[in-house]
From Swiss-Prot:
Quaternary structure (record): FHL comprises of a formate dehydrogenase, unidentified electron carriers and a hydrogenase (isoenzyme 3). In this non-energy conserving pathway molecular hydrogen and carbodioxide from formate are released.
Encoding gene, per UniProt annotation: hycG
Domain of life: Bacteria
Keyword check for Secreted: no
PROSITE patterns referenced in this protein's UniProt entry, alphabetically: COMPLEX1_20K
Keywords: 4Fe-4S, Iron, Iron-sulfur, Metal-binding, Oxidoreductase
Protein name per Swiss-Prot or TrEMBL: Formate hydrogenlyase subunit 7
Cofactor note: Binds 1 [4Fe-4S] cluster.
Binding locations of [4Fe-4S] cluster: C45, C51, C115, C145
A Gene Ontology BP annotation from the UniProt entry: formate oxidation
Taxonomic classification: Bacteria, Pseudomonadati, Pseudomonadota, Gammaproteobacteria, Enterobacterales
GO molecular function: 4 iron, 4 sulfur cluster binding; metal ion binding; NADH dehydrogenase (ubiquinone) activity; quinone binding
Essential cofactor(s): [4Fe-4S] cluster
Length: 255
């Protein structure tokens, strides 16, 4: 029973759980093995269900967390990652510790949402113990009330080291000394973004991006070149889209 209540200091006050150095080194090896997949167990410590709604939205086909190998499991004994939501209430402190102790080492702990991070707006209630880090060691904090699905995926990417992989990724034949090419560098970046967004709004993501690139390339050689390009293409739909893009450019020049 004392293990379920957790460690206490000399005055009998409960203190957060800790892990020794061997488990910390095992956690580093775990990250190498689960970079492409992870089993997650959710621990509700006493939240309002707002965070749960966003978690389920993250698992929906729209955001599709499983494309990163993130899967929810029904038991902490199957989990690589424990996701703690809500402020830790006194009633849920022992069940949360049981879940943490049931998950095999090494494991990754994520504190989810403002309540999980610090207790949130409930931090000073008599029945609230505090944030997740008051009972277990936390590896990643995902702030928000509640966090968006995009922030949720970002937090999982941080936990799994996916962002580090993306940052240091190299393409085929990519050289360190090869500078990155900036497309349409003669135009200011906000204007390039506006033209690209307008073209994608009118023609869809794929063809809109292609039209925006072609338009900016021709515009860099002068407005006469844009007219010659439209004449060569002889496409009324392209003419209409380019007229909208010309309007975007003219508005930017006036400002």
């Amino acid at each position: 029973m004392s293990n379920l209540l957790g460690p206490r200091d000399a005055n009998g006050i409960p203190v957060p759980m800790t892990v020794d150095e061997s488990i910390a080194s095992m956690k580093a090896s775990l990250l190498k093995k689960i970079k492409r997949s992870a089993y997650v167990y959710r621990v509700d410590c006493g939240g309002c269900n707002g965070c749960e709604i966003e978690i389920f939205a993250t698992l929906s086909p729209l955001f599709d967390a499983e494309r990163f190998g993130i899967k929810v499991v029904p038991s902490p004994r199957h989990a690589d990652i424990l996701l703690f939501t809500g402020a830790v209430t006194r009633a849920m402190r022992s069940p949360a510790l049981r879940a943490w102790q049931s998950a095999p080492d090494p494991k990754i702990c994520i504190s989810y949402g403002a309540c999980g991070n610090s207790g949130g707006i409930f931090h000073d209630l008599y029945c609230v113990w505090g944030g997740t880090d008051k009972i277990v060691p936390v590896d990643v904090y995902i702030p928000g009330c509640p966090p968006t699905p995009a922030a949720t995926l970002y937090g999982f990417a941080m936990a799994l080291g996916l962002l580090e992989q993306k940052i240091h990724a190299r393409g085929p034949g990519e050289l360190d000394e090869q500078p990155a090419e900036i497309l349409h560098g003669d135009m200011v970046q906000p204007l390039r973004v506006k033209v690209d967004r307008e073209a994608r709004r009118l023609a869809g993501y794929r063809y809109g991006r292609q039209i925006a690139d072609d338009y900016l390339t021709q515009l860099g050689q002068g407005e006469e070149q844009v007219a010659r390009w439209l004449e060569a293409e002889n496409d009324p739909r392209l003419n209409e889209i380019v007229s909208h893009l010309n309007h975007v450019v003219e508005e930017a020049r006036i400002r």
